[in-house]
């Protein structure tokens, strides 16, 4: 692998990012995780009792319903006994989309979402689970923030026994109604990931440390303590043949109809670690903690593993590259790639090289396209390629030479 000195330097800087602080915080950041499941199968329920939790993780924020995203709202019934058994503080969230969430041009309608929250709260109480707070996750149009603030204030008056918090977007920070909104709520979380619409011509990352820090500094000017939401996941952005954005694929979702190109959008753990290092300084004492989106579960393909996530929370570097695998049988070379890291990785381009002979035939699996190049064969990701899941091994293709010769394989771009 090339450029080892640069890579090792980068890892060293990443590892020290949370330790070398001139003015450390008086209180450590607290960590919570969004438990964002639309349904619970037995394996998911069982996994809550059979996992090594990251050090410092104290709270689970559990989805109990969605509305305004389609024709009808949807309740989510979490496994309350299993959640209680984790020993973590439990909060509840509802996701409210803009569709059907506006009662008029200046009337955000939160009634359905708040009903879902109250139902979840009552179910939790009946199951013996104490709820620390409830959160409204609503991407309110910026022009309606003042009206949204009024709805939150009214909800608090009608439901005084709960702590009511809201999620917020960086684009709201300069809006006139933003101060009213965060003053109306009992707490607020600033989302720092997936804040830009994907663009095939001008790729934008899922998360960028420098940009996130700028938003945090803007938010601190309001003088109110808050939390920030950071990503553990990856999205696959989908585009038409003309480059029009069609949506994103997360986990098991199908590609949107008409998808001709995809763009991988992973959360970069190195950038997340660097931001954690910044937030360890007491200058950012208004940032109380991190709300991680989202808690990993067995079978996740586009999410960090529990072990990888724990590394990031501990400000340790996570490996970032997959490894090529070559199996040679005479003149036949089979190529695969292996992801031994704790994060999903974009499918790589793979080069197979040899000397003193030529390729008789070659072929790629459906996720790659084979073409001659560099004195050998290059397997490039298919335009619809996605991610290599943590722990996954995937066959790339094969090359048959006219005669047996030594063969080399490497990942391009490393």
PLM regions and their residue ranges:
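Intrinsically disordered, low-complexity Pro/Gly/Ser/Thr-rich segments with frequent PxxP/GP/PP motifs
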Residues: 360-401
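Chitinase-like catalytic core of GlcNAc-active glycosidases
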Residues: 24-38, 63-190
């Amino acid at each position: 692998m090339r450029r080892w000195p640069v890579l090792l330097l980068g890892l060293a800087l990443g590892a020290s990012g949370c330790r070398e602080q001139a003015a450390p915080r008086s209180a450590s950041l607290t960590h919570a995780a969004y438990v964002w499941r639309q349904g619970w199968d037995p394996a998911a329920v069982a996994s809550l009792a059979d996992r090594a939790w990251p050090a410092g993780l104290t709270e689970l924020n559990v989805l109990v319903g969605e509305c305004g995203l389609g024709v009808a709202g949807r309740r989510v019934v979490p496994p309350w006994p299993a959640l209680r058994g984790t020993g973590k503080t439990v909060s509840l969230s509802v996701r409210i989309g803009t569709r059907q969430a506006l009662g008029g041009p200046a009337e955000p309608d939160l009634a359905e979402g708040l009903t879902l929250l109250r139902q979840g709260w009552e179910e939790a109480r009946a199951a013996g689970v104490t709820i620390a707070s409830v959160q409204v996750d609503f991407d309110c149009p910026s022009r309606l923030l003042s009206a949204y603030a009024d709805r939150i204030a009214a909800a608090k008056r009608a439901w005084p026994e709960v702590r009511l918090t809201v999620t917020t977007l960086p684009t709201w920070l300069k809006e006139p109604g933003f101060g009213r909104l965060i003053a109306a709520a009992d707490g607020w979380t600033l989302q720092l990931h997936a804040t830009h619409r994907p663009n095939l011509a001008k790729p934008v990352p899922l998360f960028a440390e420098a940009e996130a820090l700028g938003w945090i500094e803007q938010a601190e000017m309001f003088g109110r303590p808050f939390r920030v939401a950071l990503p553990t996941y990856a999205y696959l952005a989908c585009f038409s043949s003309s480059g029009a954005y069609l949506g994103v694929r997360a986990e098991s979702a199908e590609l949107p109809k008409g998808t001709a190109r995809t763009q991988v959008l992973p959360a970069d753990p190195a950038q997340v670690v660097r931001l954690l290092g910044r937030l360890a300084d007491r200058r950012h004492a208004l940032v109380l903690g991190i709300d991680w989106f989202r808690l990993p579960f067995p079978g996740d393909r586009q999410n960090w593993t529990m072990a990888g996530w724990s590394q990031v929370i501990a400000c340790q570097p996570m490996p970032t590259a997959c490894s090529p695998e070559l199996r040679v049988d005479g003149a036949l070379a089979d190529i695969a790639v292996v992801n031994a890291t704790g994060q999903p990785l974009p499918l790589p381009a793979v080069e197979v090289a040899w000397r003193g002979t030529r390729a008789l035939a070659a072929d790629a699996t459906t996720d790659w396209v084979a073409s001659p190049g560099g004195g050998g064969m290059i397997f490039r990701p298919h335009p619809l390629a996605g991610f290599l899941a943590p722990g996954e091994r995937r066959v790339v293709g094969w090359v048959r030479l006219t005669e047996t010769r030594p063969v080399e394989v490497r990942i391009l771009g490393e």
